[in-house]
Swiss-Prot record:
Family in the record: Belongs to the Tom20 family.
Mitochondrial intermembrane side: 1-8
GO terms, molecular function: mitochondrion targeting sequence binding
Organism: Saccharomyces cerevisiae (strain ATCC 204508 / S288c)
NCBIfam families: 3a0801s04tom (TIGR00985)
Domain of life, source organism: Eukaryota
Assembly behavior: Forms part of the preprotein translocase complex of the outer mitochondrial membrane (TOM complex) which consists of at least 7 different proteins (TOM5, TOM6, TOM7, TOM20, TOM22, TOM40 and TOM70). In the complex, interacts with TOM22.
Listed name of the protein: Mitochondrial import receptor subunit TOM20
Taxonomic path: Eukaryota, Fungi, Dikarya, Ascomycota, Saccharomycotina
UniProt keyword Transmembrane, yes or no: yes
Compartments where found: Mitochondrion outer membrane
Record's bilayer topology term: Single-pass membrane protein
Tagged with keyword Transmembrane: yes
């Protein structure tokens, strides 16, 4: 037992020195932060650089995701094109919705599920209604992939819907601008 006493004493002294050093550094850092303009400037620059790096990382991640979705959608549509025959559209719709629902339940199959839902959307007569249903019923990650796919390659029925929304927005902006001029 007499041998453990010096070990414990050494451990206690080492712990006390480490705690005192950490406290001293914290006090020094706080003093520099409060009183040194150069130190504050360096801290602000580091914070700006960190924010810029994070923004670049987010942008790069979005670009990679967009590229991945573009390649996948192109490959998927080349492998299984959307039918143009009206009689096949209903069967295509039900098949793709069923496959999309089945795939959405599996982890890691979000992109495949989104492509099935996208194909169903392309043959559906009222895409706005179906998008609303998708938004309420499928997981958010899959819905985001569907929106990306629509942005990459808008189907004909969705393109007319999007153009209608953009056109009405442009018309309302023109009316608002005309009202501002008259004042």
């Amino acid at each position: 037992m007499s041998q453990s006493n010096p070990i414990l004493r050494g451990l206690a002294i080492t712990t006390a020195i480490a705690a005192l050093s950490a406290t001293g550094y914290a006090i020094y850092f706080d003093y520099q932060r409060r009183n040194s303009p150069q130190f504050r400037k360096v801290l602000r620059q580091r914070a700006k650089e960190q924010a810029k790096m994070e923004e670049q990382a987010k942008t790069h991640a979005k670009e990679v995701k967009l590229q991945k979705v573009t390649e996948f959608l192109s490959m998927e549509l080349a492998k299984d094109p959307i039918p143009s025959d009206p009689s096949e559209r209903e069967a295509t719709f039900t098949t793709n919705v069923e496959n999309g629902e089945r795939l959405s339940m599996q982890q890691g199959k979000e992109l495949e599920a989104a492509s099935k839902f996208y194909k169903a959307l392309t043959v559906y007569p009222q895409p706005a209604d179906l998008l609303g249903i998708y938004q309420r019923s499928i997981p958010e990650a899959i819905y985001e992939y569907i929106i990306l796919m629509i942005a990459i390659l808008p189907p004909a029925n969705v393109a007319s819907f999007v153009k209608g929304v953009v056109g009405s927005k442009a018309e309302s902006d023109a009316v608002a601008e005309a009202n501002d001029i008259d004042d």
